[in-house]
Amino acid sequence: MGPLKGLKIIEMAGIGPGPFCGMVLADLGAEIIRVDRASAIGTGSKQDASNRGKRSIAVDLKSEKGVEVVLKLVETADAIFEGFRPGVMERLGLGPDICSERNERIVFGRMTGWGQEGPLANAAGHDINYISLTGALAAIGRPGSPPVPPLNLIGDFGGGGMLSLIHISEPTRPLYISYAV
């Protein structure tokens, strides 16, 4: 139940904002299918709270068969989102152009640290970097003392709230959203 009931969304497994975004979308009623790398199975926590409410599959994304499995999911999905560095989905054969060929209504969401272009686009993005460079870290802690890194991922969690996926209603062409945390 929830306002997103009836939406089918593919989460390309990653760290930080991706799993959180999928968790929130699932909490709001969306059907989330998490696509894990086959090599990652058994390496994470079995009690990862961000996986609640999701179904998941393990796929070898570097094989043609694995890519085809994901593209079959894309054919009936409302949205897909990922948080990889620029160009990764394209190299895998799962970029927005290919996904929209399979499903013209697909919403393709990207969450990266620094966006798809610019001087930091290919740099790994981590929450502490975002909140430091934006000045948010300076607001955390006691007056007159050095900043205190937060115990949660403020930037990532904020970025994880990609509820723009609701704009699925009637797009005239595939919708592509790129969100730099």
Indicate residue ranges for each PLM-predicted region.
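Hydrophobic alpha-helical segments, chiefly the membrane-spanning helices
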Residues: 179-181
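A structured beta-alpha segment of the ubiquitous adenosine-cofactor-binding alpha/beta core
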Residues: 10, 51-101
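Short beta-strand "acidic-cap" motif of Rossmann-like dinucleotide-binding folds
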Residues: 11, 27, 31-36
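Short glycine-/small-residue-rich Rossmann-like dinucleotide-binding loops
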Residues: 14, 61, 85-86, 112-113, ...
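Helix N-cap at the beta1-alpha1 junction of Rossmann-like dinucleotide-binding domains, i.e.
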Residues: 38-41
